[in-house]
């Protein structure tokens, strides 16, 4: 009887230990899942910030910030539809992108109010898919301007200058999300011409 009782206690102890080990394994798995979910949320927020910094830099004529959002070998192009060839571009690399969108802006000298006068980009409906250190993004945009870079504020009514969607590819480099490819698909645009 004494051995049976001891064996029962030992068996119960082993069972309890097995249960605790199993519980710890479940907690570790849950913690990993939680960390993965948190990383996904952080990635999404960081990618949205890239899109917002892009719009703000373009709106204010901050060429340095604008090109810093692209990888050194990034590609930028404009299309009427995703299946069609670009009607503007491709521009390859930061220097080519800067030359196209900020041809007369020296380094460290933002223009006042963007190159078309007061401008606002409205970017919305983000569809973001992250796969470790790469991501694809689709977002819609409307660009509103008060035309004339050298006209007094309020002298020209705001107009829609462009609208469409962004089809982006981003990569994480040195802990930062950057555009590796940006395709602007336009539904309406004016004044977009290649710079020589």
Regions found by a protein language model. Give the residues of each.
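Charge-dense, low-complexity intrinsically disordered segments
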Residues: 37, 41, 88-91, 157
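Alpha-helical segments embedded in low-complexity/disordered contexts
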Residues: 8-11, 38
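A beta-strand edge to alpha-helix "cap/lid" segment located at domain peripheries
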Residues: 29-35, 110, 114-196
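Bacterial N-terminal signal peptides
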Residues: 10-22
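N-terminal secretory signal peptides that target proteins for export/translocation
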Residues: 1-5
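A solvent-exposed, acidic/Ser-Thr-rich amphipathic alpha-helical stretch
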Residues: 63-142
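Short, low-complexity N-terminal intrinsically disordered segments enriched in polar/charged residues
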Residues: 26-72
